[in-house]
Amino acid sequence: MGIRAVSISACLMMAFHASSAQAIDLMEAWQGAIGNDRAYAVAEAGHGVTVPRQKQAAALWRPNVMLNAGAGYGRDNTDTRGAYFAGPGFGQSEDIAFSTSVNSGTTHNWALTATQPLYDPKRRAEQQQLLMSADQSDLEWGAARQSLMLGVAERYFDLALAQESLRVLQQQKQAVEKLAVEMRDRFQLGATPITDTHESEARLASIQAQVLYAEMEVETRKSVLADTTGLSSEQLFALLPYRVSDELLQTPMEQWISEAESGSFDIRMKTIAGNLARQEAKKFGLESSVKLDAIAQAGRDYISGSGDFGSASNAQTSGMIGLQVSVPLFTGGYRSAREEEAMRLADKADAEVALARQQVAQSIRATWLNLKAGSGRVQALTQALEASRLRLDATTLGHQVGDRTTLDVINAENDVASAELALTQAKVNQVLNQIRLAALAGKLDESVLNIFNRDMLAGN
C-alpha cells in the first residue's frame, strides 16, 4: 500500500468524523450569532432609543399645556389705606381704609397655562441634537452589526483552517505510520539500513506531537465559534471555500475609497459628533439668548373661613393671553464659556474625521492591493501543490526501487502537506480580505456573505 492510498484512507476517515459533527455554512453561523452574541445584544438594545429621540425632537415645537391645582388650610389678611370709593346712593369718598381677615380657612386653587414656542434658537439646536443622536444610534447599531458579521467570518474560517490543518496532519501521520511499519519489515529482511527505520519513527513522533496540538487548536476554535453562535461546540464543523470569488475586486480601488467617504461607519459617527458639538455651541450663542413664546393663562384662588370680623371669603380669578419674551441679561460669563468649549470640541471632532478618512483610505488601499496580489498567489500555490504531488509520486516510486531514501519520501510528504495548507490559507485570506474591504466602506451585509457562502457550498 503506497502513500497515496494512505492519503485516500485519511480523507475518508476525516469525512466520517465530519459527518458526525454539524456542518454549518457561513450564513447559518451568522444567523446563530445574531440571537446569541452578547456585544451585539447590547448594541441592539441601544438602538431602541432611536424612535423615542425622534419623537422628542418633534415634540419640542408643539404646545405645552400645564395644569396646577391645590387645596389646603391657610390664612389671608389684607389692609388697605387711602382707597377711593364711589357707588350709587353712597356718594364718593376718599382716603378710605378697609381690611379683610381669614385666619383659619380652607383654600383651593387652580391654574391652566398653555405655551407655544415661536422663536427659540436654543430649542431648535436641541431638536437638531436629538435628531442627530437618533442617527448616531442607528450608526452605532449598524457598526455593531457589521463588526459582528466580520467577527463571525473570521472565527468561522479560523475553525475551518484549524480543522483542515488537523486533517492534513492526520493524513501525514497515517502515511508515516505505514512507512514506519514498512521500514521495520524491510530492515528485518535486510533490505534497508536501520537509519531508515529511525528516520521514519522520529518523523512519526514529531507528527504525533503536532496532531495533539492541532486537536487542541480545533477545540479552542470550536469553543470560540460556539460562544458567538450559541451552537454546541461538539457538533460544529466549518466548511472551506471551494473556489474564491473576486466579485468585489471588480470595483476599482479609488471607487472603494470614494464609497467609504459616505459609507464608513467610523467616518459617519465622527462627523455626527462634530455636528453635535456645533449645535451645542449654538445653544449658548448670542442669537440663542432670546426666545419668544405665545402664552395663555387662566386661574382662580379661593379661601373661606372665619377671621377678625366673622365669616369671610375671598376669591380671585385671572386670565391672560399674549406674548412673552425672555432675555438673559447677565450670566457671569457662563454662556460664552460653554459656547467656546463646544466649539473646541467641534474642532477636535473635525480633526478626528480627517484622521478617520485618512486611516480608512490607507486600509482600503492595503486590503485591495493584498487582494490583487492574493489572486496571483492562489494561482501560484495551486500549481505548486500539483508539482508537490507529482514529486511525491516520483519520490515514492524511487524509494520502492531504491533510488530515494526514506527521508526523501518524508520530505516530499511534508511538501505536499505544506502546499495544501498554504493554498487553503491563501483562499481563506482572499475571502476574509474581501469581507474586510466591504466592511471598511460600510458595505458589508448579508448579500456579501452570501457571495462567499455560495463558493463554499459549491464544493460540499
Language-model features: where?
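N-terminal signal peptide c-region/cleavage motif recognized by signal peptidases
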Residues: 15-18
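Bacterial Sec-pathway N-terminal export signals of envelope proteins
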Residues: 21-70, 76-77, 116-117, 131, ...
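Periplasmic alpha-helical coiled-coil/stalk elements that build and connect Gram-negative outer-membrane
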Residues: 24, 145-259, 370, 374, ...
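A glycine-/polar-enriched beta->alpha junction
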Residues: 31-41, 48-63, 99-104, 111-129, ...
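Amphipathic alpha-helical coiled-coil segments
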Residues: 42-57, 144, 148-167, 178, ...
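Small/polar, glycine/serine/threonine/aspartate-rich low-complexity segments that form flexible
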Residues: 68-112, 241-250, 282, 295-331, ...
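Acidic, low-complexity, intrinsically disordered peripheral segments
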Residues: 75, 422-460
